[in-house]
Amino acid sequence: MGQPLKVKKRIYSQDVELVRAHIFVRGKVQGVFFRQSMKDVANKYGVKGWVRNRRDGRTVEAVLEGPKDAVLKVIEWARVGPPGARVEDLEVKWEEYKGEFNDFSILPTE
């Protein structure tokens, strides 16, 4: 028999505020690696959720869940985005935290 698997799970202390933000980033945000870059930033800060392009060709939509300070860091990054992006507008809708994600995913365009 092999060794038992060791699973890493992030556990937050009870005084950490967990939040959910639904964001829309508009401008030159498609074709500049925005989604992959956001996934990398979200993973760096331990934020879960998803990101996808919208069919209008100028909007990226994302849902971010995690500790408030980490989610705010991802939103702060999204105000500028990766090199080559030109963010014209960022809309944030705060929603009730659901804890429904295990990771951060790139979803197909909708």
Swiss-Prot record:
Q: Which UniProt keyword terms apply here?
A: Hydrolase
The Enzyme Commission number assigned here is 3.6.1.7
Highest taxon of the lineage = Archaea
Any one Gene Ontology MF annotation carried by this entry is: acylphosphatase activity
List S-S links within the chain: none
Which InterPro entries does the entry link to? Acylphosphatase, Acylphosphatase-like_dom, Acylphosphatase-like_dom_sf, Acylphosphatase_CS
| Catalytic residues in the record | 35, 53
Q: Give residue ranges for domain Acylphosphatase-like.
A: 20-108
Indicate yes or no for the key word Hydrolase.
yes
What's its catalytic activity? Answer: an acyl phosphate + H2O = a carboxylate + phosphate + H(+)
Query: Does the UniProt entry include the keyword tRNA processing?
Result: no
Tell me its family: Belongs to the acylphosphatase family.
Q: What is this protein called?
A: Acylphosphatase
Give the organism, scientific name.
Answer: Pyrobaculum calidifontis (strain DSM 21063 / JCM 11548 / VA1)
